[in-house]
């Protein structure tokens, strides 16, 4: 199984509007397009995204850049404060998927998949793209192949 995890691009500052409604900035859109270039030619089967506006915009930019035909799948289990265990429950039957989400979930999820605990989250900048590989999406059972920051 291969799994890609993408943090949304740079968004409007906190307080500009309610957190779920914060949009990408022009710089954030550029960051996302640079990260999307690393997914060209990858065997993606699905793109899952948080319902927050900035994650939806990020996922749509990636979809368009790749010419990815299937629709985006919007899920509530990719919001910022979701526990990584809940994400793993949803990935049991998945392969070659992209998750578009937020910190702290992105960093916690990457640490959990590698180490099996939450004590060592990864540091992921906006539009950072992580690639993991393993037999199954289990805590401590996946290897981080790298994190690309735009």
Identify the function of each model-found stretch.
Residues 38, 61-65, 93, 112-116, ...:
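Active-site catalytic microenvironments for nucleophilic, acid-base chemistry
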Residues 114-143, 149-150:
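Domain-level recognition of soluble alpha/beta enzyme cores
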Residues 41-43, 91-95:
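Glycine-rich phosphate-binding loop signature in dinucleotide/nucleotide-binding domains
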Residues 3, 94-101:
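Generic beta-sheet signal
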Residues 2-82, 106-107, 120-127:
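Active-site-proximal alpha-helix that buttresses catalytic centers in soluble enzyme cores
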Residues 104-112:
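Extended, charge-rich low-complexity interaction segments
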Residues 79-91:
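Short alpha-helix plus adjacent loop in nuclease-associated cores
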